[in-house]
Amino acid sequence: MVTQYLDDNWFSLFRHTMEKGRELDMNVWIYDENSYPSGFAGGHVNEAMPESYDEGVALKYLRAGVLPDTVDRFFCCLRREGDAFTDITAEAASRRGEKGDYYLFYKAYNPTSPWYSGFSYVDLMHEGVADKFIELTLDGYKKVVGEEFGGTVPGWFTDEPQIVVTDRESIRWTPDLFDAFRARWGYDLEPNLVSLWEEVGPWRQ
């Protein structure tokens, strides 16, 4: 983009557009992003809030018959016995080499891309991301538009903000998922993770 998104020149050009709209009795609508999907503010959210994109957005797993030497790299480790699962994450590192039926979960990340200014798309479920997006985009426009909101500038529109997984083998994840699940349903999701993929355990719940 020739004009740096959301810099002083950007808003100066928007002010000129707004004034021309008023002069010609035309409405000027604000699009809340520089591409799509909305939510990353052309990379400004990523830059100001690295946790908005670098803590993972999905969970995947692999099965193992032996706990590998690299088990401490996995996010969550479950041991299966029949249809029951036990969360052994806290002790997994000390049990390297033990045989069993293990489900080893790891985080997956959205790929970086020039489309996202060299970052990846943000996690819209991450606490504070929506507030930071509004602060960096719409609050900036409000300083320029002022009393013209509702007049020459009727409002703004958004374009397909997304909560997506990285592929078909993953489920959506965000840092406070386990805490939010426990607060809402009264039990832990961790030992029941496999039920989100397979018809085992309390998968009907």
Language-model features: locations:
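Mature extracytoplasmic enzyme cores
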Residues: Q4-Q205
